[in-house]
């Protein structure tokens, strides 16, 4: 029994606990709902207050508009009788307007009828008047008056045209006479020619400046390379190499003097000068260039030194030409003037102060390993001459110790360097690879070497090959100061016309200053004998000739290469 009671009590307690928990959850839910309802009530109260305010504003507006409507009704009731009066007055005015329009139309019809009647009467009167004698006279005079009026108008127009023409003639003419007009035209032509000359000079000057800028860039690059080269060497090694080079140079000069004496003895039999045919224009350009030597000494000396260096290369090329032409018996006699001219060239080259420095530079290029493009050094201006060495398009300035290439000098004194054929020049392919500066001498040597197997060399060609730009007497073919008027193409055209046959040796001098097309003929006389001999590398052969000098070269002509100031010039060959 007790157990059942305890069990039932436990059940009741559990039910009470469960029900208590349910009541607590329900109470919490009701509290949350009450809070939500309170919040909604607050919101509704706020909305109600806003609505009341809006209703109050609307009531105020309604009261204002009601008052305004009452005022409008009162004013309408007050203005209604006046409006009725205005309507009545409007109706009255409209009735009057219609009455006036009807009367105007009636008057128009009446007046139109009157006008038609008056026109008919006028026509009747005109007919009657035209039949009278006075009317006929009147019409005749009227026609005459109209004709006179038309004539006057035409005359006035013609007078206006004449006045305009006369005003044109009254303006003073720019040229009162034919002579003044011709003078003006000539002056204009002279000015245009002067302007064209100046433009040409400016273009030449700009081209020269561009060329100098390129040369300076090349020199700067080469100087940087030389500076790096000299940094790698010690001063003691440079002194030893310079001493060796001076000894070799002395031996080389002794061999050259011995060879020159032998050649002078053999060449005494052939005193006839053989020169290539050259045009008169080339000689005149030389004459104008000689006057510029005194004005531009630095530029001319620099350009001449270029040809001095290039002639050394030409001397090395001469043996190949001699070997190619050695098969012909007629061309053998042409070697003697070439050797004689090379003798004078070498004697002059020994007097050059900067000749040794060029030889020393070649060994430096060999040590640098630049075998494909050999660069030559541009000498410093410590001496009076500024020597530019252009070989394969590059120049280098050298103020310090320079070395010499051993390959350029033979170890035996039998053959000098200008008669020895280097290994690099034995084939025509190597000649084509070499890049000489663009000048008439280099163009001639290049064309001559390429055509060495087809035709024989003439004494005139050998003369050009051995020519030096700084020789004491001959400055005829000096293209370094020829004012850049004789280009390499023109020189080749003149040279291609030369007969390179040794049998025409006597015609070489006569054709030296041959008359070209469109040029004036020179007047020159020869004072040479067949008994002239060559002595000590210098020939007594000379010939004076006279020609007209340009007015620009008359004032600036130099007495260095010309012996007479009366348009007489005597050239000393060799």
From Swiss-Prot:
Residues 264-275, 552-565 have a biased composition (Low complexity). Coiled coil: none annotated. GO terms for biological process: homologous chromosome pairing at meiosis; meiotic cell cycle; meiotic DNA double-strand break processing involved in reciprocal meiotic recombination; oogenesis; regulation of DNA-binding transcription factor activity; spermatogenesis; synaptonemal complex assembly. Residues 259-313, 549-574 are annotated as: Disordered. InterPro entries: SIX6OS1. One of its GO terms (cellular component) is central element. The modification Phosphothreonine is found at residue 427. Disruption phenotype: Mice develop normally but males and females are sterile due to defects in chromosome synapsis at meiotic prophase I. Spermatogenesis proceeds normally up to prophase I until a massive apoptosis of spermatocytes takes place at stage IV. Ovaries of female mice at 4 months of age display a lack of oocytes. It is found in: Chromosome. Most abundantly expressed in testis. Also expressed in retina and skeletal muscle. Disulfide bonds: none annotated. The modification Phosphoserine is found at residue 430. Keywords: Chromosome, Developmental protein, Differentiation, DNA recombination, Meiosis, Phosphoprotein, Spermatogenesis. Its main location: nucleus. It comes from the Eukaryota. Meiotic protein that localizes to the central element of the synaptonemal complex and is required for chromosome synapsis during meiotic recombination. Required for the appropriate processing of intermediate recombination nodules before crossover formation. Interacts with SYCE1. Interacts with proteasome subunit PSMA8; to participate in meiosis progression during spermatogenesis. This is Protein SIX6OS1. It comes from Mus musculus.
